[in-house]
């Protein structure tokens, strides 16, 4: 079995200009976006997120290159230098020109309800990223077999992973087997992200012809995987002196980051919860 490693961007936004391998490649398997047999994307709601960056970097720690070796120490010691042409990142969702999804839920006449209130209470609330901090970090084993691949992993949604791999690897569903191992916590953090780490392990496994294991340490898991969304929530609530509510207007803005992932699903759940 080989150990796998993901080489990631060190800038939040820019263009990759050069990748240099500073190690003896003997015994190594190296893969980049050109080794993807299917579509270089993580298939989910939209096909906007690459499995491996081709040229553009859109967030810090974006996957660029994959390495595998039988000796884990040699794997971790392998030096890779990447040159970039940096660009200005956008960190504030209120400044972003791009909207992944807008959901409107209307019931009754909100404007009239607020006008008929004795008092309108307004508030703005900001929440930051939340790390799920599951006990077991993300990890998978990919085994090439029978003209396809079997993946064993710590994950929540095996059918998400299977669909993503059929698109990435250009394989029929019956050639992609995903086994959900006993999972040491997820809390949403292993809902869609395992499609990424599974894709990386599979690319290395298919190129090397050997099983490949990738297990993140805590630092990599925290900096590279998706989190609970930061957001800005604004409430306007109309109330009367007798305590009755006349109307509530709620605006929720989520920071979905560089790619859509499952942000519309999260937004829809927040909307239903407030209603």
What feature does the model see in each segment?
Residues 26-39, 171-179, 211-215:
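Glycine-rich phosphate/pyrophosphate-binding loops
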Residues 110, 114-169, 254-256, 263-268:
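Conserved beta-alpha junction segments in alpha/beta enzyme cores
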């Amino acid at each position: 079995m080989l150990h796998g490693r993901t080489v990631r961007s060190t800038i939040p936004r820019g263009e990759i200009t050069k990748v240099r391998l500073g190690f003896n490649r003997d015994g190594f398997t190296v893969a980049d976006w050109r080794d993807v047999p299917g579509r270089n994307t993580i298939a989910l709601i939209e096909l906007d997120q690459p499995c491996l960056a081709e040229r553009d970097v859109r967030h810090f720690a974006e996957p660029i290159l994959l390495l595998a070796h039988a000796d884990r120490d040699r794997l971790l010691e392998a030096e890779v230098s990447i040159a970039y042409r940096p660009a200005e990142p956008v960190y504030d969702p209120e400044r972003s020109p791009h909207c992944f999804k807008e959901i409107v839920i209307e019931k009754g006449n909100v404007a009239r309800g607020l006008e008929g209130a004795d008092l309108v209470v307004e508030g703005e609330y900001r929440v930051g990223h939340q790390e799920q901090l599951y006990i077991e970090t993300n990890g998978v084993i990919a085994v090439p077999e029978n003209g396809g691949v079997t993946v064993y992993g710590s994950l929540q949604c095996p059918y998400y992973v299977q669909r993503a791999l059929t698109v990435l690897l250009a394989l029929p569903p019956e050639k992609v087997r995903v086994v959900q191992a006993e999972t040491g916590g997820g809390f949403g953090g292993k809902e869609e992200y395992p499609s990424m780490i599974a894709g990386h392990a599979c690319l290395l496994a298919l190129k090397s012809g050997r099983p490949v294991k990738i297990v993140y340490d805590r630092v990599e898991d925290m900096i590279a995987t998706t989190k609970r969304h930061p957001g800005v929530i604004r409430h306007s609530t109309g109330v009367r002196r007798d305590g009755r509510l006349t109307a509530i207007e709620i605006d929720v803005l989520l920071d979905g980051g560089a790619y859509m992932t499952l942000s519309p699903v999260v937004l829809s759940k927040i909307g239903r919860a407030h209603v």
